[in-house]
Amino acid sequence: MGKKGKGIKPVVDNRRARYEYHIKENLEAGLVLVGTEVKSLRMGKANLRDAYAVVKDGEIWVNNFHISPYDKGNQFNHDPLRPKKLLLHRREINRLYALQREKGLTLIPLKIYFKEGRAKMDLAVAVGKKLYDKREDIASRDAWRDMERSLKERNRA
């Protein structure tokens, strides 16, 4: 038997979250998964697009986190949209509960990765962006691209 791989292996990234939300802070949480979920996750068959986390009964749960059923699974295959429990310390859960109760703050998963063989989730405390914020981001990105393009052309000449 070989050793478990060291380091971080990214699996799924919620790229839309940085466009839709202002990220206030990040933290790492462990995931409670069943066997077929882990196998599907290792194959990269998951979607974080509409996922969000809630604090319920002193525990943190992720809802709308879709993990596709494992191809070689049988009748014991998992439900793709079942709520998944996150593993955090009690004081972190209490702090997140207080933050979640504030108006406008939400818990959004940013990415899923494997760290030393264990599934981890990068969770963010975020505030939803307004439409004008999104437009500003697009405009600044376009301006940055134009500047980079002009510098590149200037350096070629």
From Swiss-Prot:
It comes from the Bacteria. InterPro entries: SmpB, SsrA-bd_prot, SsrA-bd_prot_CS. Coiled coil: none annotated. The keyword RNA-binding applies. GO terms for biological process: trans-translation. One of its GO terms (molecular function) is RNA binding. Pfam families: SmpB. GO terms for cellular component: cytosol. Keywords: Cytoplasm, RNA-binding. It is found in: Cytoplasm. Disulfide bonds: none annotated. Required for rescue of stalled ribosomes mediated by trans-translation. Binds to transfer-messenger RNA (tmRNA), required for stable association of tmRNA with ribosomes. tmRNA and SmpB together mimic tRNA shape, replacing the anticodon stem-loop with SmpB. tmRNA is encoded by the ssrA gene; the 2 termini fold to resemble tRNA(Ala) and it encodes a 'tag peptide', a short internal open reading frame. During trans-translation Ala-aminoacylated tmRNA acts like a tRNA, entering the A-site of stalled ribosomes, displacing the stalled mRNA. Belongs to the SmpB family. This is SsrA-binding protein. The gene is smpB.
